[in-house]
Amino acid sequence: GFRERRALLPDFRRRAEALYGLPDGEGLAVSLVRNQPWSGYNWYDGGRRSRVDLNTDLPIRAADLLFVLPHETYPGHHLEHAWHEAHLVDGLGRMEASVLGINTPECLLSEGLADLGVAGAQRGARAADRVHDLKGILAR
């Protein structure tokens, strides 16, 4: 189930670190939730920390999980927000950059960046190999 699938996070984190680097002190926690309209959601808590919720009510196929987890975590929303805070807020003192608007043009850009990050992180790893890796994790 979902608990075993979270075993993919260290791999996603390593790939993102190799491609984009990781800001100091970043981290996240993954929670399983119910009764939500989405399959996954990133709640950025600040301090380079995120809480990622995965909805267990919706069926998520193995292939879907190879998109949802990195989209919300590494190199997706979590890493984007952590770097945003590290550079703009902490580095340049732009406190206004600590406000994350919902249903704004910035939100649209964030979705696109998360999708592009996933595509970049998965380049070089054939989808068949990734699904094979996932099947091994799920079989445990």
Residues covered by each model-derived region:
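Contiguous, non-catalytic segments that form substrate-binding/exosite surfaces or channel walls
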Residues: 1-52, 59
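Hydrophobic (often cysteine-bearing) scaffold residues that line and stabilize catalytic clefts
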Residues: 5-8, 66, 106, 110
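Primarily interfacial, aromatic-capped hydrophobic alpha-helices that serve as membrane anchors
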Residues: 11, 34, 114, 120-121
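Short, solvent-exposed loop/turn segments at the edges of secondary structure
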Residues: 45-49, 63, 109-112
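Short alpha-helix carrying the canonical HExxH Zn2+-binding catalytic motif
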Residues: 62-79
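Post-HEXXH active-site segment of zinc metalloproteases
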Residues: 63, 79-106
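Long, well-ordered alpha-helical segments
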Residues: 75-87, 120-130
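Long, amphipathic alpha-helical stalk/connector segments used for oligomerization, subunit docking
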Residues: 111, 118-140
